[in-house]
Amino acid sequence: MPTPTPKKVTEIPTIDVVLVVAATESAAYALDTASEIAVEPQVEEEEAVRLVVKGKLKAQKQKVSTITGNQITLTDNVFSPELVQMLQGGTIKYWQEAGQETEGTEDKGFGVSSYTPPTVGSGIHGSVFTLRAYSAQYDTSGQIVRYECIEYPNCQGVPVAFASEDGAFRAPEYTINSAPKSDEAPYKITYVSTLPSVS
């Protein structure tokens, strides 16, 4: 059988973590301060089976790998209480006036006064959300021509820990597990001309 003539592949060079959006049905939060997203596929493996008779391989069944989701590690450069609340639950309180003397749960534009995680053993978890990570595609003139969006479904965060050191701004790492539903892809890549608007 003749070999088909090779066709040049589509080349899509992307760079940077331009924007990250975490969205539930009732809220969406955008981060333009994230510096890295590492994704590790979660794979269940069925080991290979080989029939070896007197030192000779007679037959074999290849190893089967099944993807069950992705573990996403998001490195941010600032603390984002709204994202942390989405990841692990808890309560955010806001200053209710410019003098910053009274706390409340309504954001009136005077800033965050506190974040408290769920109590130990409460069984409270964060929300299930969709994560969209945007990267930029540049042309040879150095201009952005469009954006790549990778969407991960059914994301849930794990409890967050914080570390600090002298002379360095904190760069929190958030671990997120994404597990698709039955007949759902573990991620989807789309290309868009503009980023979503952020208020």
Residue ranges and their predicted role:
Residues 2-89, 154-168:
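Solvent-exposed edge beta-strands and adjacent loop segments
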Residues 12, 67-71, 126-130, 145, ...:
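A general secondary-structure signal for short beta-strands and their flanking turns/coil
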Residues 25-29, 134-146, 191-195:
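Acidic Ser/Thr/Pro-rich low-complexity disordered segments
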Residues 28-30, 122-124, 184, 199:
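Basic/polar low-complexity intrinsically disordered segments
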Residues 64-65, 118-123, 139-142, 160-171:
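Exposed beta-sheet edge/beta-hairpin loop segments within beta-rich domains
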Residues 65-132:
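Extracellular-facing segments of soluble proteins and assemblies that are Gly/Ser/Thr-biased and enriched
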Residues 123-153:
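Extended, acidic-biased charged interface segments
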Residues 146-199:
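Mixed-charge, glycine-accented linear interaction segment located at domain edges/termini
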